Amino acid sequence: MAGAKEIKTKIASVKNTQKITSAMEMVAASKMRRAQERMAASRPYAESMRKVIGHVAQGSLEYKHPYLEVREAKRVGYIVVATDRGLCGGLNVNLFKKVVADVKSWKEQGAEFEFCPIGARSVQFFKSFGGQVSAQASGLGDAPKLNDLIGTVQVMLEAYNEGKLDRLYVVFNKFVNTMTQTPVIEQLLPLPKSEDDEVAHRWDYIYEPDPKALLDTLLVRYVESQVYQGVVENIASEQAARMVAMKAATDNAGTLIDDLQLVYNKARQAAITQELSEIVSGASAV
């Protein structure tokens, strides 16, 4: 059994770690609330944009935008949103597993692929994973702006415009609640048709000044908004996962301290018993 002094040192070390994880839990909780507010503010716009674009994809237009045309998938692009920092449980690992599984299914169909990682962990993973990394972004902070992403997204859009990509997806962790964050893969291009029941009405739109000018701008804004929403959702997911992970670490540290305290008490008791035995033996000898 380790000595009482050594055990006491371990207890002090674990207590220091517990203070750190507890502080990180509180910081993550605060950041999560702010991230949720930003996510809630941008989500209605992103969902409305997705719905409108879905109806446009179903409509009969005199101008057929290239983003509406489905072509054979020879090369697939992924915009993968992960975190800049760790200590957030299995958030990034689960996301990467989902991407790898999807890449494998496309690979079996003979398709090639390229990536646009967003977040330091995503950049690190895909540089070692293999496949072309066409663009990347990291260090966006806890409150990114749309302008921070436009250049990165534009690289992938240009590749699609030039026929170098036939499919484009965005991958991120969707925030469900504090305890649940789900990795999702959403198709950006070609535009997915709306699954909304309202599509049965076959909405008809009047375009001013003309369909081409409007759609050329609108569809690019759509892709940018969906990627931005993915980044905002992922930040909220990151803070929630980190808060839960740090709470678990704090609780585990408390359990470990209790166990070490018990061992310390036993060691201390054994030392006292030994000292008493030595005193009694010495007295008997006299």
Swiss-Prot record:
Keywords: ATP synthesis, Cell inner membrane, Cell membrane, CF(1), Hydrogen ion transport, Ion transport, Membrane, Transport. CDD domains: F1-ATPase_gamma. Its main location: membrane. GO terms for cellular component: plasma membrane; proton-transporting ATP synthase complex. One of its GO terms (biological process) is proton motive force-driven ATP synthesis. InterPro entries: ATP_synth_F1_ATPase_gsu (IPR035968), ATP_synth_F1_gsu (IPR000131), ATP_synth_F1_gsu_CS (IPR023632). One of its GO terms (molecular function) is ATP binding. It is found in: Cell inner membrane. Belongs to the ATPase gamma chain family. F-type ATPases have 2 components, CF(1) - the catalytic core - and CF(0) - the membrane proton channel. CF(1) has five subunits: alpha(3), beta(3), gamma(1), delta(1), epsilon(1). CF(0) has three main subunits: a, b and c. Produces ATP from ADP in the presence of a proton gradient across the membrane. The gamma chain is believed to be important in regulating ATPase activity and the flow of protons through the CF(0) complex. This is ATP synthase gamma chain. The lineage of its organism: Bacteria, Pseudomonadati, Pseudomonadota, Gammaproteobacteria, Alteromonadales. The gene is atpG.
